[in-house]
Amino acid sequence: MPELTAKLNEITKEKSGVTRLTLSDFRNYRSLRIEAEIAPIVITGENGSGKTNILEAISFLTPGRGLRSAKLADIKRILPPEEEILNTNSGWSVAAEILKNNEEYLIGTGTQKSFREDTEEDEIKNFERRIVKINQQKITQQSELGKYISAIWVTPQMDRLFLGGTQPRRSFLDRLVYAFDLEHAKRTANFEHLYRQWFQILKSGHADEHWLQSVEADMATLGAAIAAARRELIARLNTFIAHEPDDIFPDVRLELDGTIEKMLDTMPAVKVGQF
């Protein structure tokens, strides 16, 4: 085990990680505070005691929808009737102290109720909205979280990751990219927004041609940049695998197979986005 010990020592030298985690009305926890050191940690307990809920809470310190991809409203602890009457805060929250390169940061995220007008039904509706704060300052872009902490997870539901559809694999790869490219989360979010917009334009049946072309051009530019970032991550992994041979498992070489990915073999991303 000396090789493993050496690698763990190298990781902990950087002194980066979660040193305090506080949950409020999160899943099965009314309140929870965990103090931790910068070291590998194993969480144990009975089935259903909330081990995965702690991991999910940590995953919300990174960009995205967490390791379960749950709806915001589903995360809040179900209150008993006697608490529901007295409860004035309808949301959940996760707060953490982060130590990164020997500097401390405060990260908080949670939900609050907001209201918007439904013009079709002529009424005001409330909805859950996620807010994020870094060092007590509210931020508008979740991608900012990537500057302070990155996380990768493999859950039992991902056991057939390489046997199922391509979308889960792309999502998993994108989360790996986030650790090296802070702008990648913003690019993927913008692409998904444009895709929904593009779909609605086509669905309407009376699309403005210039508007459609503009959206498609933006999607092409973002798509090429996303593919290029994924290729760079794959290249990093292949380099690591080549320099860290394993005596137990066979060697592997990773590749991305797709039209844009093949075009990037011979063309820069800027030109591919304009193709």
Region locations from a protein language model:
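Regular, well-ordered alpha-helical segments
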Residues: 60-63, 200
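An accessory alpha-helical subdomain
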Residues: 154, 158-248, 257-260
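A short acidic, often aromatic-flanked loop/helix-cap motif at beta-alpha or helix-coil junctions
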Residues: 42, 115, 159-160, 259-264
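Small-residue-rich helix-loop
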Residues: 245, 257-275
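Residues at or immediately flanking beta-strands
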Residues: 33, 72, 234, 251-253
